[in-house]
């Protein structure tokens, strides 16, 4: 679980991130599809060209879910229960993709907030996103 210091770091950075959530979400997905093209198979109906309306809309949804997890940092499992079920039972997303997405989000955060993403903040976000990924894959077990 996260320490109090880690929760503080995540909460304070989220304030900055949330004001750019759409851009960050879109860039995160663009990175995901560029770096891990196999992830595109889950979006056969999407226009996956950089900056497309569908990519922007889904990027916004992804960051909104991260925001829900931040708001419910002590109970991420409850906050993301419906998403967990959707991705496991309906969409059947390979769990490794959540790790890839987390990595791409960290890279995007580093590019947007280089001064904020200190080693300590990077570690806190990595730990938090590992928790989020764990929640999103818990229905697979």
Curated annotation (Swiss-Prot):
Tell me where in this chain the PTM Phosphoserine is found: 52, 72
Kindly state a single biological-process term from the GO annotations of this entry: cellular oxidant detoxification
Residues that hold heme b according to the record: 58, 87
UniProt-recorded Gene Ontology molecular function terms: heme binding; iron ion binding; oxygen binding; oxygen carrier activity
Q: Which residues carry this modification: Phosphothreonine?
A: 28
Looking at the record's lineage, which domain of life comes first? Answer: Eukaryota
Q: Per the database record, which ranges form the Globin domain?
A: 1-141
Question: Which residues are annotated with the PTM N-acetylserine?
Answer: 1
Whether Iron counts among this entry's keywords is yes
Quaternary structure, from the entry: Heterotetramer of two zeta chains and two epsilon chains.
**Protein name as it appears in the record:** Hemoglobin subunit zeta
């Amino acid at each position: 679980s996260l320490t109090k210091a880690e929760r503080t770091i995540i909460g304070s950075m989220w304030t900055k991130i949330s004001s750019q959530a759409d851009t960050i979400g879109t860039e995160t997905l663009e990175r995901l599809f560029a770096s891990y093209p196999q992830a595109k198979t889950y979006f056969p109906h999407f226009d996956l060209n950089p900056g497309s309306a569908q990519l922007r809309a889904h990027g916004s949804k992804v960051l909104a879910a991260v925001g829900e997890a931040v708001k419910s940092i002590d109970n991420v499992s409850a906050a993301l229960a419906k998403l967990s079920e959707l991705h496991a039972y309906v969409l059947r997303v390979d769990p490794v993709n959540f790790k890839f997405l987390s990595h791409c989000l960290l890279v995007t955060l580093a590019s947007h907030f280089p001064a904020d993403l200190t080693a300590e903040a990077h570690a806190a976000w990595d730990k938090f996103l590992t928790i989020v990924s764990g929640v999103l894959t818990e229905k697979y077990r």
